[in-house]
Amino acid sequence: MTDLTEKNTALEEKIESAVENQQKSIWKEIFAQGIWKNNPAVVQLLGLCPLLAVSSTATNALGLGLATMLVLTCTNTVISLFRQYIPKEIRIPIYVMIIATTVTAVQLLMNAYTYTLYQSLGIFIPLIVTNCIIIGRAEAFASKNSLLHSIWDGFSMGLGMALSLTILGALREIIGQGTIFEGIENLFGEQAKFLTHHIYHTDSSFLLFILPPGAFIGLGLLLAIKNRIDNIKK
C-alpha cells in the first residue's frame, strides 16, 4: 500500500513538472514569435505606413513604438476579457471601437505629457487605429486565448514592433544626421538627455536617408540581415 502511494505521488509530481514546463515553453514561444519569428514589422510587414514615415529619427520611432505597444497590450487585454460576450457576427466593428478608444486615450496622454513628440508624430498617432497588426492580434490571438497569454502576446508583438521601429529610426538618424536619440528629452524628460550622442559632425545632412527612400533602403537592410541570420541558424 505504501509503495502504491509513493508511486502515485511520484506520478503526480511528474505530471505537475510536465505541465509547468509546458507552460514555460508557451510563454517563451509567444515572446519569441513577437520579437523574432513572427515580428510584425520585418516578418509580417504590417504597419509599413508609420514604420516608414515616422522612423526618420530614433526618438520619433521609439515614441510611436511605445504607443503601439501600449495599444496592443490594452486591446488584447480587453478583447480577451470580453471574448465570450462579443457576438461573432459583429466582432470586427467592436474590435475597431475598442482599438479606437485605446488609441484616443494614448493620444490624449501624449498630448498632455509629451507635447513636442505629439506634434512631431502628428497624424500617425490616430492612424494606429488602422494598423493591421493590432486588429490582426485581436482576431487571431486575443479572441481565442486566455487573458494572461493575450496580455503577453500583445506586449511581445508590441515590443517587437517598437524594437524594429527604433532600430530603423536609429539607422536612418545615424547615417542621415550623424546623431542618435536627438530630442529624446521630449519623450522621457531632461534626465534622458545623456542618451543623445553625436556620432560624427557634418555641415549638411545625408538627405537620402532622412527622406522616404532612406526608409525603404533601411527596411531592406533589416530584412536582409534577419533573413541572413535565420539562414545561418538553419
Curated annotation (Swiss-Prot):
Belongs to the NqrDE/RnfAE family. GO terms for biological process: electron transport chain. One of its GO terms (cellular component) is plasma membrane. This is Ion-translocating oxidoreductase complex subunit E. The chain crosses the membrane at residues 62-82, 92-112, 116-136, 151-171, 205-225. Part of a membrane-bound complex that couples electron transfer with translocation of ions across the membrane. Keywords: Cell inner membrane, Cell membrane, Electron transport, Membrane, Translocase, Transmembrane, Transmembrane helix, Transport. The complex is composed of six subunits: RnfA, RnfB, RnfC, RnfD, RnfE and RnfG. Its EC number is 7.-.-.-. It comes from Haemophilus influenzae (strain PittGG). It is a multi-pass membrane protein. The keyword Membrane applies. It comes from the Bacteria. It is an enzyme of class 7 (translocase).
